[in-house]
Amino acid sequence: MSDQVLKLVPKDKYFVPEINSAEKARELLEVFFPDGEQAEVEFSDSVKFIDSGSNLEKITCSLCCKSMEINPFQENDIGAEWWYELDETLSSSPDLQTLNVKMPCCGKYAAIQSVDFCGSASFSMFELCIWNPYSDDGISKVQLSELEGILGCELKQIWACY
């Protein structure tokens, strides 16, 4: 069985909340999802890629503006091959500020942070998440607003599947 992870990251990728605020938000996330398996906070000294695992379905190139579907179940899927290579690169590249990647659509190199992951991935220095929250509805607007108030920033939701 796969794991579902609700990830919450600041819309401002450079925003990092106070440690106490992050811990309060983590505790509240556990209250919101009492059946969830593990709530976590993660801080980073630099911007990191926040992935969605197998939920990544589409990217849009920042250079040629073409959208490309990513289907790992389709044989010889160029988008999926590109994603697997990128995933390896991201795990071994400590500096996303200078990382350029070859785009599968136009063959040109784009800054990784300029690629549009169509809402299913992001970049951030802070992440709040809960594993297997067991909620079909996700987080409500009221709950999201409460977490945003504690952390002092607007949040973006990313659902990941591993």
Model-derived features with residue positions:
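N-terminal alpha-helical interaction blocks
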Residues: 1-59
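Acidic, proline/glycine-rich low-complexity IDRs
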Residues: 1-5, 105-107, 111-162
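A structural detector for beta-sheet-dominated domains
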Residues: 9-11, 44, 62, 69-73, ...
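Short, charged/polar micro-motifs that form catalytic or ligand-binding hotspots
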Residues: 50-54, 92, 96, 133, ...
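Generic beta-strand structural signal
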Residues: 57, 99, 124-126
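Short cysteine-rich clusters marking metal-coordination/redox-active sites
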Residues: 61-64, 103-106
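Short recognition patches in nucleic-acid-associated and regulatory proteins
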Residues: 66-93
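Short linker/helix segments within small regulatory modules
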Residues: 83-101, 117-120
